[in-house]
Amino acid sequence: MEKYIGVKLISAEPQIEGGFSTAGQHGGIIAREGYKVVYEDGYKSWSPKDAFEKAYIKVKPFPSIEETARPPHQQRVIDEMYDLEEKRLKLNAFIGGSEIFTKLDLDEQSRLKQQSLVMQAYVTILIERIENFK
């Protein structure tokens, strides 16, 4: 069987399966911990906690960056974060809506999707660094 990597931006929040307030046995039903998932097109689903946390990386919101003078090494990190995010968004637009992308061979499509995931992880690390600037 072939392997695939999906690239999609979702919204999610912790939720117990079946809408119960706690995990465990409820009558004849076993409710598990998991996440309510909402896709960009509005589709809603539920995912078990372990599967969700293995498949998704939490996207940190961009930090509020004051327009003040910063040491050059910090400003370079901020500039790099914005530059990388701009490139990542362009890549995702290409992946999600380009006829050219659909004509690429599946291996190249997979590499581009992997690249997007790595870029998101990199942006998240840069955001964490920026949030901890003193």
What name fits each language-model region?
Residues 1-77, 95, 126-127:
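Motif-centric detector for short Cys/His coordination patterns
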Residues 61-134:
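Extended, charge-rich alpha-helical interface modules
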